[in-house]
Amino acid sequence: MIVLLAFIHRDLILDTHHIPYDYDTYHWPLFSEVASRVANRQGIGWDTSEYGGAPLLTNVNAAVFYPPHLAVLLAVRLTRLRVTLREFAFVELSHWVLLAVTSFIYLRVRGVARRWTVVSTGILLGSGALLSQSQHLGVIEIVSWLPLALLATEHAVDRRTALSGALLGLVLATMLTAGFLPQFVACLLFLMTWALVRVFQTGAPALRVLLVLAEGLVTALCYGAVIVLPLLHDRATYPQVDAPAAFPVQILKTTFAPDALGHLEGDPARYVNPTDITWSYYYIGAFAVVAGLASLLTRERSARGPQVVLIVLVLAGFGQTADALAGIARSLPVVGQLYRASPVPVLLCFAMWLLLAQALQRGRWPRAVILLTMVLISGGLLLTHAQIGSETARVSAWSMPAVAWIILGASTVALLSQRPTLILAVAVAGVIELVVVNSGGFWFSSPGPAQRWDERHVTSGYDAALAFLQQDKGQFRVAVDQAVMTDTWDNGWRVWGLDSISGFDPQHNGAWVTLAEHLGARQYAAPRRFSLDQLSSGVLQLFNIKYLVWRAGTVPPLPPGLTVAFTDDLYSIVRVATFRPRVYLTSRSCATVSAAFEQTSSRCRDVIRVQVRPSTAGHLDVDLPSGHGAGLLVTGTAAFPGWRAAVDGVSRGTRDAFGAVQAVNVEAGDERVVLDYRPVSTPVGLSISAASLSGLMILALYSQGPLARRRQGARAGRTDGSSSI
């Protein structure tokens, strides 16, 4: 199965892949940026590519403090090697191996026979939800620790010691630092529900168990303080959450229903999805099945629990398969929410894995019924993965689902027969299928427009557009339509080398979202996408945006002030006729949210230029012109709370302008303004994380004495017993 997983990652075995773009065009460039700074012994300051100018330490998806990433960064620091896509692929593949090992260990500890452990773990690794979530590195990294977290939870409930709570906290902290917070919250709910049911079934003292679990959670939060504090205090960048200010509500919303609760943000139309009806199976059922699973896997006292689990899973399987088929019939580029970052389907697969392994072991129901349930669930998941693969690999929209169903059906027959030879033959057929699909050498291979675009896009097709932009030596921003970034999002500009433009600073799109939400824009498409319906040329000026990039032939009707400056068969570049400087002085009354769109007053149109000294993304040094009056120094930098300002050497508070960008009030006669990004939460979080890790080490060392004496006493007891016989 691990070999099969290697085939779906680009550059490990073949040069094509099934994984959509987030994996190799978001997570890799982001981690590569961190690694390059470490290798060059630079500070891990600002990321000038992901989300256009976000602090790296407050971007949880960078996962700088995730222990396996720290190990890689240490190796990079010692060797000063560059993290290529191939090396990065091994980071994710190693977590697939970890998931296989931890799943195998858990089932063996639970007493499941070796053959059913292997079968169930193989089905888990090959489930469509996990495969389709391979593009989200954080999902795979967190889920790979989930079996160990399950063992640690059971150990904490059974032993109820400080050390067991600390061990649970250490596993949870590792999952937390991976950065994919909706998946972590969902897994945490899964584990806590599991612990609660186990308490009722074993008769353990509930209060003591609660204290141990609370110890584990506090330990995890303390160790993960370096990312938790920036999220809560510094409005850290988190792409799965649209409004960081509403962090707790947004995380829970994203966990249970990424698109179904849009009314929380005042715009239900923005979050309507035609597949939400079928997804009600998962939002209600995925966590409801935990009680039945717990009764199945721990000395069950009622036979109804497993039956409820089976019924819910069958309904979920029918719903998901119907959803996948309907999505493909509608020719959706992706099916339902599986393509999105929803953690619920992943947990559903995890629940299916536990149920399948234990049910096969006990033979409580006919194995044909159990495997049929598995087929219904994984069938929809696999169809979804196949549809995603048809968008990124060299296959047609129907060929991959057809092959997927053939392989899935053959696998079911093989498992029902329980003949090792037949199972091995189907596994070999699966390997051949992946090789053929990836290599594009079969008769159904038909590179479509999207694939031809991708081939030119990642080679040299952008050279002409890049050369045009590099001719302009001024300080400006480039905004990119989401359609251009189908494969690379905003960080594609860094891959292309656009950060080499003098003074270039990609637009922080979160500022656009904030501004649009302030103004109640009803049809704002999504984060990282702009719409000329809301962002007129006047608004573009405010953000120092001089050029906009579209795919050729997709430029919409342009409002006054925007003209097409460059076009070829791939790209069209639009120039904003008049745009404001990177930093300028204006009247304080002109920095309101309404002024961002209206710009009716002539005094608000006129700005005073300032002299910018050599600066970086986290440091801005400005000389003010002589004779200026009191006003507002407006920067093009997104307004993060971690900014500190000094005017003529005297500390002065910062504020936001237009509801989105950083600004400083200046008085007449002020000469120099220096802004530095120095968030308090980062060093405080680092201190708490380091202190908690030290505390765990002290607790572990302190516990070695009692544990050793306990083992010695147990050994002595066995010796005395044998001698008396």
Which residues does each PLM region occupy?
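Extracytoplasmic
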Residues: 428-608, 613-621, 625-628, 638-640, ...
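Periplasmic/ER-lumenal interhelical loops and adjacent helix-loop junctions
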Residues: 28-42, 50, 70, 217-297, ...
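Membrane-embedded helix bundles of polyisoprenyl
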Residues: 92-110, 114-200, 212-232, 237, ...
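Membrane-interface micro-motifs in multi-pass membrane enzymes
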Residues: 61, 89-96, 123-147, 177-187, ...
